[in-house]
Amino acid sequence: MSCQDYVDKQLLASRCVTKAAIAGHDGNLWAKSEGFEVSKEELTKLVQGFEEQDILTSSGVTLAGNRYIYLSGTDRVIRAKLGKVGVHCMKTTQAVVVSLYEDPIQPQQAASVVEKLGDYLVSCGY
């Protein structure tokens, strides 16, 4: 499967994710959902935030021009929210899976779908 297939057939098809992208650690976009215009700068800062959560705590998580409030994170997962829209991101060996979900989808539902794909990508060396 291509990265675009993972976005379309794994993340969006689950109906637990409303927008998604997969990018390399360098911020280069590998695939994205239609209308999700996330920039290389936003992705680069997000990837940096996995190691340095302080930058996200102070300035939030910006995706497609929208600034989300950073909720929590580890070296593997980042969570943020703005109003009724949540963010769940997972870092793999070579990539980052970025997702947005909206009410009434629960955070755990989006997390499950994103992390299942992330774990699969890790098992494949990505």
From Swiss-Prot:
Belongs to the profilin family. One of its GO terms (molecular function) is actin monomer binding. Signal peptide: none annotated. Binds to actin and affects the structure of the cytoskeleton. At high concentrations, profilin prevents the polymerization of actin, whereas it enhances it at low concentrations. By binding to PIP2, it inhibits the formation of IP3 and DG. Keywords: Actin-binding, Cytoplasm, Cytoskeleton. Occurs in many kinds of cells as a complex with monomeric actin in a 1:1 ratio. It comes from the Eukaryota. Coiled coil: none annotated. It is found in: Cytoplasm, Cytoskeleton. CDD domains: PROF (cd00148). It comes from Apis mellifera (Honeybee). This is Profilin. One of its GO terms (cellular component) is cytoskeleton. Pfam families: Profilin. Gene3D superfamilies: Dynein light chain 2a, cytoplasmic. The lineage of its organism: Eukaryota, Metazoa, Ecdysozoa, Arthropoda, Hexapoda. PANTHER family: PROFILIN. SMART domains: PROF. The keyword Kinase does not apply.
